[in-house]
Amino acid sequence: MESVRSLVEDKPVVIFSKSSCCMSHSIQTLISGFGAKMTVYELDQFSNGQEIEKALVQMGCKPSVPAVFIGQQFIGGANQVMTLQVKNQLAAMLRRAGAIWV
């Protein structure tokens, strides 16, 4: 889990993804639609991607991708992010994290 913490440190939005995952792509599209500054880690392109994926599962992210962190806080996967959007809470959370300025 330390490897995950070091990757999300000092970044407003981090998405752990796999390049072949359509839900990961959808969440990236949603968040980038706000003009948010985000960092995306494609786990299938990392040499230690499986290790990071195991750490994400230990943190409670099932399925392991997408795993979204906003303001260094673990938000969850696609369902949790979409729920925030439906409740009109996602934009405010992105603002508080410094990912968007509006």
Curated annotation (Swiss-Prot):
Its main location: cytoplasm. [2Fe-2S] cluster binds at C21. One of its GO terms (molecular function) is metal ion binding. Gene3D superfamilies: Glutaredoxin. Pfam families: Glutaredoxin. Transmembrane segments: none annotated. Residues 1-101 form the Glutaredoxin domain. It is found in: Cytoplasm. May only reduce GSH-thiol disulfides, but not protein disulfides. Belongs to the glutaredoxin family. CC-type subfamily. This is Monothiol glutaredoxin-S6. It comes from Arabidopsis thaliana.
